[in-house]
Amino acid sequence: IIHNLFTPRMLPFLKKKINYDHIAWVTYTHPEIATFGVNQSQLRERKISYELFDYDFEHDDRAITSDSTYGRSKVYVGTKGKQKGKILGGTMIADAAGELIQELILAKKANLDIKHIFGKVYPYPTASRVNKYTIRPWFARKLNERTKRIFKWLY
């Protein structure tokens, strides 16, 4: 942004267009509200195919131990074409949501597939595991019924 304030007058050919799809913001209330990327209405307007993943912190182990179970995470993931499996945007309402959402912001900016977040090993219990839990249903669908029963029995 600073670049665009000074450069156009001096060197107009260096002017860069700002991509607002990568802008994030946090509202510092209690709890915090952190948002990044595109929202649901923008996705519909652009006719982008997506799936919404929603996770409530009520039963999250770290949220329970830190007495901050009031929280929710919503993440939009592309479902078709080059955006399939890519994080498109999201919102988190929680204590320290501005810090918890950083991993998702980086994944969006770097155009990482959600398997990179899901495949990451998080220390237990870590607050940022909510990012993995939010997108878990994407991968759970791919398991066959026998595997699901085994995991249900184990966990």
Language model regions located:
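Short, glycine-/aromatic-enriched active-site segment of Class I SAM-dependent methyltransferases
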Residues: 22-24
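Flexible, glycine-rich terminal cap/loop adjacent to redox cofactors
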Residues: 28-39, 44-155
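Internal hydrophobic alpha-helix adjacent to the cofactor/substrate pocket in enzyme cavities
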Residues: 1-20, 48-49, 108-114
